[in-house]
């Protein structure tokens, strides 16, 4: 018989709660690219979806407070880039992602890769100030790794010629843009280290877009710079351009010309030393601020997990799940009832008295036709009788008498004059004929 302590025996709910906390605390924030499927937007305003690729899929939830910031309408089939934290939906034990931001895959992809690599290398200590090498106070030879046709090389050579013409320069020509550029620059750093012919290396180019400078965000190049035994100055773009190479190099110069000033001496070499220290201090401050920002983000993430809104989100997700289950149950009930009604209707049709009704209707139609025929005959007879009566009536009609040459004389008041004594001199008489009337005055 097995014997276990109470501490080793889990309930299902406790196990799911422990796994959820483990996922949320250990994994933190992740960036993920995938295709949307099973997208759902209930009345609660939250979004539920599945992110998948050709071999796997994961369920996701994006709560209303976060999806309001999404600038496009997601749909099944969209390729998206999401920022999310891992979690577990405890009621079902489903592993899921809680999405905090979403954008189409192409938008911001380079910036997200930049931030991810930056965090990775910082966590490994590649940006630590303790790993930085000091620049030689009096370099004997300077190596320049850049394009042999670019403006950066000519800017560096002009500054060195003006400030310290006797300082030897070794140029390691490479591409500084495109897919092969990072590998070429890493190989050039390796050659410079194996030859051991320079005291300091300048790696850089002129300004450009994020895509133009992307080769300086390459992980292989970054690790090669960090492993170099020769101090390296990163001089990429303009002062506002920042790359991974800037963080991992021993010192960052805002421009190629500034890098040349760092390795050359002139009458203001004391001021130059101050500039060097300022750059070191700025680099240290940037690293310190980056570390503090990362710690603040971690603390903020922990605080968000303990915020009541997080618990509300989980409860709302459970409510949405219950709502969807209720809808499915109602649909099944309605479907079952419809099928029962259809079966009863079919049985009723099999026993329908339609045929008998059709026969009775046929008989009724025949009776109706006979009745109509009888009515027609009766009407014909009555019309004939009416015509005969009309002829008889016409023979005694006053109008018929008028047509035979007779007339009727009346006073203006309409009284019929039948005798001469009925009128006097001056009376107006109206004599009605068959085709009109005459008016006359008695003299």
Curated annotation (Swiss-Prot):
<dbReference type="Pfam" id="PF02601">
    <property type="entry name" value="Exonuc_VII_L"/>
</dbReference>
<keyword id="KW-0378">Hydrolase</keyword>
<dbReference type="InterPro" id="IPR020579">
    <property type="entry name" value="Exonuc_VII_lsu_C"/>
</dbReference>
<protein>
    <recommendedName>
        <fullName>Exodeoxyribonuclease 7 large subunit</fullName>
        <ecNumber>3.1.11.6</ecNumber>
    </recommendedName>
</protein>
<comment type="function">
    <text>Bidirectionally degrades single-stranded DNA into large acid-insoluble oligonucleotides, which are then degraded further into small acid-soluble oligonucleotides.</text>
</comment>
<dbReference type="GO" id="GO:0006308">
    <property type="term" value="P:DNA catabolic process"/>
</dbReference>
<keyword id="KW-0963">Cytoplasm</keyword>
<dbReference type="GO" id="GO:0008855">
    <property type="term" value="F:exodeoxyribonuclease VII activity"/>
</dbReference>
<dbReference type="InterPro" id="IPR003753">
    <property type="entry name" value="Exonuc_VII_L"/>
</dbReference>
<keyword id="KW-0269">Exonuclease</keyword>
<dbReference type="GO" id="GO:0009318">
    <property type="term" value="C:exodeoxyribonuclease VII complex"/>
</dbReference>
<dbReference type="Pfam" id="PF13742">
    <property type="entry name" value="tRNA_anti_2"/>
</dbReference>
<dbReference type="InterPro" id="IPR025824">
    <property type="entry name" value="OB-fold_nuc-bd_dom"/>
</dbReference>
<keyword id="KW-0540">Nuclease</keyword>
<dbReference type="GO" id="GO:0005737">
    <property type="term" value="C:cytoplasm"/>
</dbReference>
<comment type="similarity">
    <text>Belongs to the XseA family.</text>
</comment>
<comment type="subunit">
    <text>Heterooligomer composed of large and small subunits.</text>
</comment>
<dbReference type="GO" id="GO:0003676">
    <property type="term" value="F:nucleic acid binding"/>
</dbReference>
């Amino acid at each position: 018989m097995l014997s276990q302590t109470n501490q080793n025996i889990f309930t299902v709910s406790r196990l799911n709660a422990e796994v959820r906390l483990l996922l949320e605390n250990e994994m933190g924030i992740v960036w993920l690219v995938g295709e949307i499927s099973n997208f759902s937007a209930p009345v609660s305003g939250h979004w539920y979806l599945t992110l998948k690729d050709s071999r796997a899929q994961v369920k996701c939830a994006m709560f209303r407070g976060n999806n309001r910031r999404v600038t496009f309408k997601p749909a099944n089939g969209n390729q998206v880039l999401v920022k999310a934290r891992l979690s577990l939906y405890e009621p079902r034990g489903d592993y899921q992602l809680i999405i905090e931001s979403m954008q189409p895959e192409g938008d911001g992809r380079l910036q997200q890769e930049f931030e991810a690599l930056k965090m990775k290398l910082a966590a490994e200590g590649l940006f630590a100030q303790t790993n930085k090498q000091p620049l030689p106070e009096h370099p004997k030879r300077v190596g320049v790794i850049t394009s042999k046709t670019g403006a950066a090389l000519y800017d560096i050579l002009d500054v060195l010629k003006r400030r310290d013409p006797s300082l030897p320069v070794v140029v390691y020509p490479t591409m500084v843009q495109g897919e092969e550029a990072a590998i070429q620059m890493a190989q050039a750093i390796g050659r410079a280290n194996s030859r051991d012919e320079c005291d300091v290396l300048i790696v850089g180019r002129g300004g450009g877009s994020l895509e133009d400078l992307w080769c300086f965000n390459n992980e292989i190049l970054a690790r090669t710079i960090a492993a170099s035994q020769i101090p390296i100055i990163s001089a990429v773009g303009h002062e506002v351009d920042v790359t991974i190479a800037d963080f991992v190099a021993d010192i960052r110069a805002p421009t190629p010309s500034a890098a040349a000033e760092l390795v050359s001496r002139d009458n203001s070499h004391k001021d130059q030393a101050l500039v060097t220290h300022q750059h070191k201090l700025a680099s240290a401050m940037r690293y310190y601020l980056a570390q503090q920002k990362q710690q603040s983000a971690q603390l903020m993430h922990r605080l968000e997990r303990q915020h009541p809104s997080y618990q509300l989100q989980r409860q709302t997700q459970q409510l949405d799940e219950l709502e969807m289950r209720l809808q499915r149950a109602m649909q099944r009930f309605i479907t079952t009832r419809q099928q029962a009604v259809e079966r009863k209707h079919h049985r009723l049709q099999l026993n329908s008295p339609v045929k008998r009704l059709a026969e009775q209707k046929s008989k009724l139609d025949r009776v109706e036709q006979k009745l109509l025929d009888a009515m027609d005959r009766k009407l014909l007879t009555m019309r004939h009788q009416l015509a005969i009566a009309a002829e008889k009536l016409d023979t005694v009609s006053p109008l018929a008498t008028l047509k035979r040459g007779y007339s009727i004389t009346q006073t203006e008041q309409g009284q019929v004059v039948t005798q001469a004594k009925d009128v006097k001199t001056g009376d107006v008489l109206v004599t009605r004929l068959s085709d009109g009337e005459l008016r006359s005055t008695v003299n």
